[in-house]
A protein has these predicted regions:
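Extracellular glycan-modifying ectodomains
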Residues: 2-7, 36-348
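Bacterial N-terminal signal peptides
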Residues: 21-31
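Bacterial N-terminal signal peptides that target proteins for export
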Residues: 3-23
């Protein structure tokens, strides 16, 4: 398991593993490495003029991953995922760990006007984020409205996603981290640890490169037409280093959006003024196995956090642990198996 304290941002890694489904390939350029940005699993075809099955080429060089439905919302699947999350929250609470479900919104919601001609977001998908939040609230899971946070950033004239990449900008990650830190301080006012132990924020640098969607899925001529863009990266402060142990009152588990390259865990630690640890993993593993890998780890057994942030992604929220063809074979399990492993990891 890739469990770290605040990972030092490094340049994107471009190594692809042959034979992986589309899901694994989609995020191969994600910051410090590949993580599970979710997408339907399928063998990626060779780049061609018609790449619409993989990436939507929109207006002004805007690219969108094509694995989220623009027209339909499977409410049965949404509610099934919510039930598992609510059950997990209750079991964690019994162990003294508060669950913070962090649902990140779809890129397309903020840039519908940049979609290709003829592509529109249906009314149900436009409301999908709020629909999921409603499902969670009905089940007793109160979650941060990250869409509202990002909408505020966007209203201020700052982009919240990169033009040719599937990932969020540092401004979006920072705003979300600040909002989540405020929630945590309110709900858990007595965080363990000492003041002054949060991560100091380093200087911002800028990198010119192709976004992952352009790099991986566009033929050379089209990639050149889309062009490189500037990524803002906050380098590690000189005083920042890895923790000697896994002791931290807050842990984050999720996919590539929460890796250090995009700045979220560092900003969360800085805002909380406490250490934060994070685990994420390369490939199409999905959020369910990532949570289990942390709960089943020595880090959790010896140093359970007070708050566990479990990050999910709106377009694939309904993909449960049993989602054949979405996660790799080693990650597939029935909901009952997922629950049994959670119970065992928590000693219940």
């Amino acid at each position: 398991m890739d469990t770290h304290s605040l990972l030092t941002p490094t340049a994107p890694r471009r190594r692809l593993r042959a034979g992986l489904p589309l899901l694994a390939v989609l995020c191969a350029l994600a910051g410090t490495g590949v993580a599970q940005a979710q997408a339907p699993a399928a063998a990626p075809p060779a780049a061609s003029k018609d790449d619409s099955a993989i990436v939507l080429v929109g207006k002004d060089g805007w690219l969108f991953p094509a694995w989220g439905s623009l027209s339909e919302v499977d409410m049965q699947a949404v509610d099934a995922s919510t039930r598992l999350i609510a059950e997990t929250k209750a079991r964690l609470a019994a162990r003294g760990v508060r669950l913070e479900l962090l649902l990140l919104p779809d890129k397309v919601l903020f840039y519908e006007d940049r979609l290709p001609a003829g592509k529109v977001v249906s009314a149900s998908v436009e409301k999908r984020y709020d629909t999921i939040l409603g499902s969670l609230q009905k089940a007793g899971v109160d979650a941060l409205d990250a869409r509202k946070v990002l909408a505020g950033v966007r209203a201020g004239g700052t982009d919240v996603f990169y033009r040719s990449d599937q990932h969020w900008t540092q401004a979006a990650a920072d705003a979300t981290a600040d909002a989540l830190a405020a929630r945590i301080k309110q709900t858990v006012p007595n965080l363990a640890g000492e003041p002054g132990t949060g991560t100091p924020l380093g200087k911002e640098t800028r990198e010119r490169r192709y976004g992952d969607l352009a790099e991986l899925f566009l033929p050379p001529e089209q990639r050149a037409a889309v062009g490189r863009e500037t990524f803002t990266v906050r380098r590690a402060a000189e005083s920042q280093g890895l923790l000697d142990s896994g002791k931290a009152p807050v842990h984050v588990t999720g996919h590539s959006m929460v890796q250090a390259y995009f700045g979220f865990p560092q900003k969360l630690s800085n805002a909380l003024d406490r250490p934060v640890t994070v685990n994420w993993k390369a490939g199409n593993v999905g959020p369910w196995i990532m949570l289990l890998e942390y709960l089943e780890s020595d880090d959790f057994r010896t140093n359970p956090p007070q708050v566990l942030v479990w990050q999910m992604f709106e377009p694939v929220y309904g993909f449960g642990p049993q989602a054949q063809g979405q996660w790799d074979n080693a990650s597939i399990m029935t909901p009952a198996q997922f629950t049994a492993r959670v119970n065992k990891a928590l000693g219940q």
